[in-house]
Amino acid sequence: ETDGIAGYQLFEAGSGIPIGPVESLSDEWVDLILHTLKESERLGLEFAMHNCPGWSSSGGPWITPDKAMQIITWSETKITVGKQVRIQLPTPKHMFDYYIDTYCLAIPANMKVIPRLSILELSNRLDKDGVLTWDVPTGEWLIMRFGQTAKDQKNKSAPSKSTGLDCDKFSTEALDYHLNCMFKRLMPAMEKIAKHSKIGLLIDSYETGDQDWTSDMPAYFEQSHGYELYPFLPVLANKIVESEESTKRFLFDFRRVRADMFAERYYGHFQKRCKEKGIITYTEPYGGNMMEELQVAQQLDINMGEF
């Protein structure tokens, strides 16, 4: 305080340093953090800490695959018959024995540019075991079975005991779950001290990669842009739908939705949760391809850089 230090930020880091005598996230660790909070209050110092172990981004051993970052996955099957078929479609590649079907589409096979109106939506003909029953029109068709799975992305640079999957950045419910698990033993003291002293939480530079799906992505997309997402799903599998121009326009809209969901549901919701407790928010608003930095920066109280 005499030297002009007004506060500090605490990181539970685990990269490049020896493992200490106190186990990360243990009861002893919690007691030490609570002691640090009280000492900061006594000394008139601002206490801030990262929102999860490590320094990026929001995860831990409590995050299950259904609450982790979600990505789209698909399999392809060619068929050439003009009659009813009952066929087992291959399950798309997935992680952690976690997979949910989203759409089943049929598109004309061997076409460089796929007319939008030729894409058939067959999801209601696909059963829970991945068996498709369909009266196939004459011609050669490519069946695309789309689904979602969890991304194998963990919080960065955390001790091994407190490393786990990173939460879904497009889901406020997943972020709520993470924050509740991380701070359930600390938040009562933090909220109490925040009434008369400075307490902060931080999302450091974003280093846990992209995601491209969440359960309500189709509804959010249609509400934002006024057209359905599913006919353009083949674009995410490197195909051209309608025209090159239409495909590029869809990709712009899709990336816009990702950026909006990321800013609103991750950074914006983090700010909302912290504000409810009287806690100041910090961020380094950069590091990920799916973010618009200025859109992210305006969500939180204080922006930072590093050098």
Residue ranges of each PLM-predicted region?
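Mature extracytoplasmic enzyme cores
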Residues: 1-3, 7, 23-252, 260-262
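N-terminal-proximal low-complexity accessory segments that begin disordered
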Residues: 1-18, 22-23, 294-297, 303-305
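Generic beta-strand/beta-sheet core signal
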Residues: 10-13, 50, 203-204, 280-286, ...
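Carbohydrate-binding surfaces in secreted/extracellular proteins
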Residues: 47, 270, 281
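Hydrophobic targeting/anchoring helices
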Residues: 56-61, 277-307
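Active-site-adjacent structural elements in folded domains
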Residues: 253, 257, 261, 285-290
